């Protein structure tokens, strides 16, 4: 496990194993484990002290635009890659699983199957918000893992794919944030 995510990863493995144990021990129970990639969307936390990357960047760029800031710092060099899926797409997947429960694999990753660099996310969010300033890499800040991307081969075989584009997801999230 990657050190900064070890506790989270172990908790997911433990929960999946518990579901597997219960399902195998008693035929009246049938559990499925869905492991999503990183999520963002409406009702997210936008407080920079306890938010995930996309809502934090939305707030950061929104504030920079309002304040007329010409520069925004990006932690690290911005080349690390992350996979973020709009939360509404996960809700859709869960609904599909309920409708096709017997076909749903016991354990399945849910994601886009593609990732973007941190720089790409900043540019996409700036475009939605209408921010025209520049981004500066703060190389004194940590980069984290170079890539976080889930394997979606089983998801593809199941016949499901996300519907929300990055631009639409960011726009939906930003519109919610402005309310």
What do these predicted ranges mean?
Residues 1-40, 44-50:
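Catalytic helix-loop patch of NAD(P)-dependent Rossmann-fold dehydrogenases
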Residues 63-179:
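C-terminal substrate-binding subdomain of Rossmann-fold SDR/epimerase-dehydratase oxidoreductases
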Residues 8, 51, 55-65:
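Mobile, glycine-enriched helix-loop/loop "lid" segments at the mouths of ligand-binding/catalytic clefts
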């Amino acid at each position: 496990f990657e050190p900064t995510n070890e506790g989270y990863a172990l908790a997911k493995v433990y929960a999946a194993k518990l579901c597997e144990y219960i399902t195998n021990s008693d035929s009246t129970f049938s559990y499925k484990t869905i492991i999503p990639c990183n999520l963002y969307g409406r009702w997210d936390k936008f407080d920079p002290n306890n938010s995930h990357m996309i809502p934090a960047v939305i707030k950061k760029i929104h504030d920079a635009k309002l304040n007329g800031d010409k520069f925004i710092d990006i932690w690290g060099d911005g080349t690390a890659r992350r996979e973020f899926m709009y939360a509404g797409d996960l809700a859709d997947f869960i609904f599909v699983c309920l409708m096709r429960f017997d076909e749903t694999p016991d354990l399945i990753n849910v994601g886009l199957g593609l990732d973007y660099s941190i720089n790409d996310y900043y540019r996409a969010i700036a475009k939605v918000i209408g921010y025209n300033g520049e981004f500066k890499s703060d190389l004194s800040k940590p980069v984290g893992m170079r890539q976080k991307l889930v394997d979606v081969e089983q998801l593809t075989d199941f016949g499901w794919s996300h519907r929300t584009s990055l631009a639409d997801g960011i726009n939906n999230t930003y519109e919610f944030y402005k309310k």
